Amino acid sequence: MSTYAIIKTGGKQVKVEVGQAIYVEKIDAEAGAEITFNEVVLVGGDKTVVGTPVVEGATVVGTVEKQGKQKKVVTFKYKPKKGSHRKQGHRQPYTKVVINAIKA
């Protein structure tokens, strides 16, 4: 059974495995930089360890592959018969990380 972990990053929990590429909320790091996730909630595999609230001494190491922005989301507000409308767009920034190791 392959080892996996659940980490907390950007206010969300993400299940990761070694070699997997994940998209997370923007992290201030250059492409190619190595980052460490210290908030590991669960480590699974042959023996599952659940943290209370985090697993002590467990870390997940990854490499930043690229920074980017998601597709544009457009919001449009409109009031009938008043000639009032507002169009606004938003592109959420993200970081693509490739998981290198899970240390439990």
From Swiss-Prot:
GO biological process: translation
Highest taxon of source: Bacteria
Keyword RNA-binding: yes
GO MF annotation terms: rRNA binding; structural constituent of ribosome
Subunit text: Part of the 50S ribosomal subunit. Contacts protein L20.
NCBIfam families with a match to the protein in the record: L21
Function: This protein binds to 23S rRNA in the presence of protein L20.
Entry's family note: Belongs to the bacterial ribosomal protein bL21 family.
Official protein name in the record: Large ribosomal subunit protein bL21
Phylogenetic placement of the source organism: Bacteria, Bacillati, Bacillota, Bacilli, Lactobacillales
